[in-house]
Design a protein with these regions (language model features):
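Active-site-adjacent structural segments surrounding the nucleophilic cysteine of cysteine proteases
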Residues: 6, 10-130, 249-250
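Active-site-adjacent substructure of cysteine-protease-like catalytic cores
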Residues: 152-210
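Structured segments of extracytoplasmic/periplasmic soluble domains
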Residues: 107-111, 115, 140-147, 162-166
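Short, surface-exposed acidic-centric catalytic microdomains
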Residues: 125-141
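Noncatalytic regulatory segments and standalone regulatory/sensor domains
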Residues: 51, 79, 194-250
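Extracytoplasmic/secreted proteins, especially bacterial periplasmic and envelope-associated proteins
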Residues: 99, 103-107, 136-143, 158, ...
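Solvent-exposed, acidic/flexible segments
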Residues: 93-102, 130-134, 152, 156, ...
Length: 250
């Protein structure tokens, strides 16, 4: 090197773009608390402190977000579901007063595009047995190409899960007697949605009086808001997790 030659300088690394979000997450997915990882994360901590100490405090926005509760899962389906209401009391059979189960199952079948009315469904169900028979209802629904199941271990979580999956549910409950002592042979309606305070029903018999028992009206039972407080004891009359329900899907 001649006296006039410039002194060599250290090579400057080429400027690099910051990590992408995906690349950044890869580091934490590979985290196993190994010694070299612990050393690397400490180097990162010291570098962040040198740049801005406020970033590593409990009050830092990222720290608050990181420790916050996850947002509740949202359903891809409407709540309440768009289920057409059927009135059991105008059934062509002339015995609609005892056909709440059939009219409720008809709402399920109609929702899935298998029938156009409860009278159409009732004619199919009659081939398999009486309206009060769960087996007759299951056979009728299955004959329409639907997967149908009856259970007596339902609870609120099961109903909400079905609604979130886009499936209305037929439910059997005691509509007579006071809410503290429900009684009677039972009634069927269709849960089409829910909120924190209420279950939303298409009730084929109209609007129920959940406190005293019976019905306040037998006209339009579409979208009735039945409070969990007063309806759930009528549904789970035999104890928690003892609700009768019929689920249905293609």
């Amino acid at each position: 090197m001649s006296p006039s030659s410039p002194a060599p300088t250290a090579a400057t690394p080429a400027a690099q773009a910051p990590f992408t979000a995906e690349r950044w997450q890869q580091f934490w997915k590979a985290w196993k608390a190994q010694p070299q990882q612990l050393e690397g994360i400490e180097q990162l901590r010291q570098a962040v402190i040198a740049a801005d100490q406020a970033l590593l405090t409990e009050a830092a926005p990222w720290r608050q977000t990181f420790s916050s509760s996850p947002a509740p899962e949202t359903s891809a389906h409407a709540n309440p579901l768009p289920v057409a209401w059927e009135n059991q009391n105008d059934n062509a059979s002339g015995t609609g007063y005892r056909e709440c189960f059939s009219s409720s199952c008809a709402m399920l079948a109609r929702y899935w595009g298998k029938v156009g009315s409860d009278d159409e469904y009732n004619a199919i169900r009659a081939k398999y047995g009486d309206s009060t028979s769960a087996e007759a209802q299951l056979s009728a629904l299955r004959s329409l190409g639907l997967t149908a199941n009856f259970a007596t271990n339902g609870d609120r979580a099961a109903l909400e899960q079905q609604i979130n999956l886009g499936r209305p549910v037929a439910v059997g409950w005691l509509h007579h007697g006071s809410v503290s002592a429900p009684s009677g042979g039972g009634h069927w309606s269709v849960v089409i949605g829910f909120t924190e305070a209420v279950s939303i029903h298409n009730d084929p018999n109209g609007e129920a009086d959940l406190v005293a028992g019976g019905y306040t009206a037998n006209t339009n039972g579409a979208g009735q808001h039945y409070s969990w407080k007063n309806w759930q004891p009528r549904w789970e009359a035999d104890g928690p997790g003892a609700g009768w329900l019929l689920t249905c899907q293609p």
